[in-house]
């Protein structure tokens, strides 16, 4: 389809920019935007962090995290000494329809990176996203789990980037850091592509698909601000964060039900007890 030129919108310290866009049928466009937060008075040569989410349309925790990061920065924007680029939705069609992949194509957005400027629509969009993120000092790729698994806040890194990324991962206020073998990592993911293009990238995972878990989200937001303080992006004292468990390959287990069925409490559930209070 036709490619549209970037458009930039300004609102106080927030600059909303079109990263990449493609024409769709019936006079519509697929548009990926980013919010850039910065204090222009600090100059151009500033540390930069990119926060990316919305790769899968059924993962909503990242939406809350992006909102909360923007809200806190706007509340005390005089403390912002660097550049914060927020990509809240890199799979707009998936988020609009609540589907994990890209509708119509049944394609996982996290399997087309680094993309191709001359490729099909998904590959073209992926290439535009990668090109825009390159130059960041750090990227955080935020995911939720699927609808069948509830995961505690965690940071995932592979073993060939462990030396560079583990210090950052420990600052993220996650409950554990999962270091896994690079052999099991698909090279078409956003994180793999960025790490191999020179942008240190952390993957965070938490919660359940199609839901928002505010407690987990707030923990990760605190971790992001702690990380930004250490990077010189946020002028404030680093936050106290969890000391995560460091897990390597073979040390992580998923607890799953052996039988299908319906869970019934024989006594009031913790939620009902809390409501009665």
Locate the predicted segments by residue.
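Single conserved hydrophobic/aromatic residue that forms the stacking wall/gate
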Residues: 1-7, 265-277
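Short glycine- and acidic-rich boundary segments immediately preceding or forming the N-terminal edge
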Residues: 5-35
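Short beta-strand-to-loop junctions in surface cap/lid or active-site-entrance loops
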Residues: 34-45
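Active-site/substrate-binding loop(s) of hydrolase catalytic cores
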Residues: 45-46, 60-61, 65-189, 193-206, ...
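Conserved phosphate/anionic-ligand binding catalytic regions in large, soluble enzymes, centered on
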Residues: 56
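Active-site-adjacent mobile loop/cap segments within catalytic or ligand-binding domains
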Residues: 188-237, 251
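Generic structural motif
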Residues: 232-267, 271
């Amino acid at each position: 389809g036709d490619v549209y030129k970037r458009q930039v919108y300004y609102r106080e310290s927030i600059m909303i920019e079109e990263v990449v866009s493609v024409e769709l049928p019936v006079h519509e466009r697929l548009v990926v935007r980013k919010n850039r937060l910065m204090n222009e008075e600090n100059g151009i040569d500033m540390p930069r962090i990119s926060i990316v989410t919305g790769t899968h349309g059924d993962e909503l925790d990242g939406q809350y995290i992006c909102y909360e990061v923007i809200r806190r920065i706007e509340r005390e924007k005089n403390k912002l000494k660097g550049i914060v680029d927020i990509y809240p939705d890199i799979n707009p069609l998936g988020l609009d329809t609540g589907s994990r992949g890209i509708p119509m194509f049944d394609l996982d957005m996290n399997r087309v990176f680094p993309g191709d400027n001359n490729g099909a629509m998904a590959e073209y969009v992926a290439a535009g996203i990668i090109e825009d993120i390159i130059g960041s000092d750090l990227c955080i790729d935020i995911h939720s789990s699927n609808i069948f698994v509830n995961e505690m806040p965690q940071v995932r890194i592979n073993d060939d980037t462990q030396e560079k990324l583990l210090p950052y991962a420990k600052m993220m206020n996650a409950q554990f850091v999962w270091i896994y073998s690079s052999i099991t990592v698909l090279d078409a993911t956003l994180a793999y592509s960025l790490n191999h293009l020179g942008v240190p990238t952390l993957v965070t995972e938490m919660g359940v698909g199609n839901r928002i878990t505010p407690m987990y989200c707030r923990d990760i937001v605190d971790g992001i601000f702690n990380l930004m303080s250490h990077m010189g992006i946020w002028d404030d004292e680093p936050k106290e964060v969890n000391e995560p468990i460091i897990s390597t390959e073979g040390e992580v287990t998923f607890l799953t039900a052996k039988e299908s069925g319906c869970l019934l409490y024989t006594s009031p559930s913790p939620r009902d007890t809390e409501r009665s209070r």
